[in-house]
Amino acid sequence: MIKVGILSDTHITKITEQFRKNCASAFDGCDAIIHAGDLTDISILSTFTGKDIYGVCGNMCNQATRQLLPETKIIYLNGYSIGICHGTGPRHNIEERLLRLLPGTDCIVYGHTHTPICHNTGNTLFINPGSFQGTGNYGAPGTYGVLHIEKDSLKGSIHELVRKT
C-alpha cells in the first residue's frame, strides 16, 4: 500500500514551527506528498524531506514558484493515474473543467476553493484537501487529505488538523 498526504492552499512564505508540527502530525507514515498549489513559496516543500513530493503552482504562488512548478501534472502510483491541478475560476463546475483538463485519470487532486471534498464521479476519485492553514479568525480548522493506494483500490479521506490550544 502507498499512503499519500495531500495538502493545498498553505498560503505561507516561510516555514513556521507550527507548520512543521502540523505537517509532522498530519503526514506521519505517508510515503509521498501532493501539494495542490498556492503553497506561495517553493521553500515550503522542504518540510517534506524523505518523502516523494509532487506539486503544482496555484494562482497565489510567487513568480519563482510558478517557474519551477507546472500548472498541471499527472503522476502514476501503483498503476493508478493521478492528475494534479490547483484549479482556476469560479467554484461552479470546477470538477467538470478538471475532467476536461485531465481526462481519463483515476484520481484528480485539486485545491483553490478551500472546500474539502472527497467523492467519486463516474470512475474518477476527486480529492480537494481544503485549506491546510484553515480560515483563521473564522474558526474553521485546517484540513488535509490522505490517499490510500492499494493494488485494487484508491481510497481518499479528509481530516481536520488538531486545533492549537
Predicted features along the sequence, with ranges:
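N-terminal active-site segment of His-dependent metallophosphoesterases
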Residues: M1-K51, C61-P70, G139-G142, T165
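Active-site neighborhood of phospho(di)ester-bond hydrolases with catalytic His/Asp-centered motifs
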Residues: I6-S8, A32-D38, Y54-N59, I84-H86, ...
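Pre-active-site segment of Zn-dependent metallo-hydrolases
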Residues: I15-A26, I84-C85, G89-L102
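Short, conserved loop/helix-junction motifs that constitute active-site signature segments
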Residues: D28, T47-G50, L77, R100-P103, ...
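Conserved beta-sheet core of the metallophosphoesterase superfamily
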Residues: Y54-G55, P90-S157
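Helix-adjacent hinge/juxtasegments
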Residues: Y54-N93, G104
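Short, solvent-exposed aromatic-acidic interface loops
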Residues: G156-T165
